[in-house]
């Protein structure tokens, strides 16, 4: 990580002590980065974003406006989090019986280059696979395998995408029309 003069923080945002921010990262209006958070290089944090204690965010990540990344969430490199999408970190929250602290928080992993659309809800304790595409408004209740296309409430796999997010079509043998992938037992494999 680098000195503050190598990244940008808007004057309306607040960075707690003990935060590590990578080079060329930009943190925009009214955002709060809490103690122990680590944000990689070349990452953009939009307006009104909260990054909780001890969250790890990779390089080249884009987190759009109005997103809260709660403790227990880890975001790998090149992930896109759409505006107003929601992470959760407790499986059965109750106001009467507070569940605060790392022993209650479920781990959620967003793998490299996944894209999460606007207004998506990701329940805690899940893994969103590499290059996954989660459609706007989906409610993700199960792990999403690498390259899967997930939409709806509850979220369902409705197809598969390539690294650029283009939907793949398959023949009757499970081979992609582009000839680069094969689908076996709901797992997308490179040929």
Model-derived segments and spans:
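Flexible, glycine/small-residue-enriched loop-and-beta-strand segment within the central core
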Residues: 3-5, 11, 16-21, 26-127
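P-loop NTP-binding/switch modules centered on Walker-like glycine-rich loops
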Residues: 112-113, 130-131, 141
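The −1 position to Zn-ligating cysteines in a subset of zinc-ribbon hairpins
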Residues: 149, 161, 167, 174-177
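Short metal-coordination and nucleic-acid-contact micro-motifs, chiefly zinc-binding Cys/His arrays
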Residues: 155-158, 172-174
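Cys/His-rich microdomains that often coordinate metals
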Residues: 157, 166-169, 181-183
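Cysteine-rich micro-motifs
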Residues: 173-186
